């Protein structure tokens, strides 16, 4: 028998405040048509005062645990993928651990910006396969509205806040691609491109800073690298793009999503798209899309799913799993 890390629960949380594109017209030289044409985004959610990355992560986690019929005390580990932790330390994951009332196991954060959830899933898979954990909560949560430069129309209209979570559990499989669970992963980074997407603050500056992005350069890297990492992960799983039921990409920009699908040879009716409603929620975007796709009845048990993401660093990767 082969051990597999299987998704048994999924959930998400979105703040109540919905911000349509038209709201930016009041303060910026932009409009709804311009934003939609360049990104596919129509609206996004922003966290309220008092809402935090950790509180959103905990809410998404409760939904995932509920779906799985599990309690917080059943969980061995929590991994939170985020670039907007509430404090420098302790980690967002330990804050979630406390909020859920989990008094055992361990918790830590992963920071790979928009690729963070893919990196966190890979880490969780390794923990399960090595026998260090049997149940792992994997969460992507972000409050990007708090690192926006509201005078920069090229970035502030793109991002939103929210959280998504999955519960991974160890289950026995047959060792074939028919197994439920994570079948393969592929992770990459290249620090030579660190200046393409970054925040200009941190402990070295004594400021929180703002997100800065060379959008055209990021786009040029994104489609090529996303298609390549997805192809590598599919090959490692012993499957091909034609076998895939659903591509669940990082929801950064509809043009990147469409370009990557075309390069993979996958039609858009097999791609879960939520960018129009959520904007770019960075590490939260894939678990949000998984949860929404499942709730819509798109993603069903037994479906072959590939997720792929790229973020600042640059860091990029993909995970192939059977739901």
UniProtKB/Swiss-Prot annotation:
Active site: 114, 250, 280
Keyword Transport found: no
Catalytic activity entry: malonyl-[ACP] + acetyl-CoA + H(+) = 3-oxobutanoyl-[ACP] + CO2 + CoA
Described function: Catalyzes the condensation reaction of fatty acid synthesis by the addition to an acyl acceptor of two carbons from malonyl-ACP. Catalyzes the first condensation reaction which initiates fatty acid synthesis and may therefore play a role in governing the total rate of fatty acid production. Possesses both acetoacetyl-ACP synthase and acetyl transacylase activities. Its substrate specificity determines the biosynthesis of branched-chain and/or straight-chain of fatty acids.
UniProt protein name: Beta-ketoacyl-[acyl-carrier-protein] synthase III
SUPFAM superfamilies the record matches: Thiolase-like (SSF53901)
Compartments, record wording: Cytoplasm
Similarity remark: Belongs to the thiolase-like superfamily. FabH family.
Pathway(s) served: Lipid metabolism; fatty acid biosynthesis
GO CC aspect terms: cytoplasm
EC number: 2.3.1.180
Quaternary structure note: Homodimer.
Keywords, sorted A to Z: Acyltransferase, Cytoplasm, Fatty acid biosynthesis, Fatty acid metabolism, Lipid biosynthesis, Lipid metabolism, Multifunctional enzyme, Transferase
Segments crossing the lipid bilayer: none
GO biological process annotation, one example: secondary metabolite biosynthetic process
Keyword Transmembrane helix carried by entry: no
Domain notes: The last Arg residue of the ACP-binding site is essential for the weak association between ACP/AcpP and FabH.
NCBIfam families: fabH, PRK09352.1
Primary location class: cytoplasm
InterPro entries from the UniProt entry: ACP_syn_III_C, ACP_syn_III_N, FabH, Thiolase-like
GO MF assignments: 3-oxoacyl-[acyl-carrier-protein] synthase activity; beta-ketoacyl-acyl-carrier-protein synthase III activity
Organism in which the protein naturally occurs: Roseobacter denitrificans (strain ATCC 33942 / OCh 114)
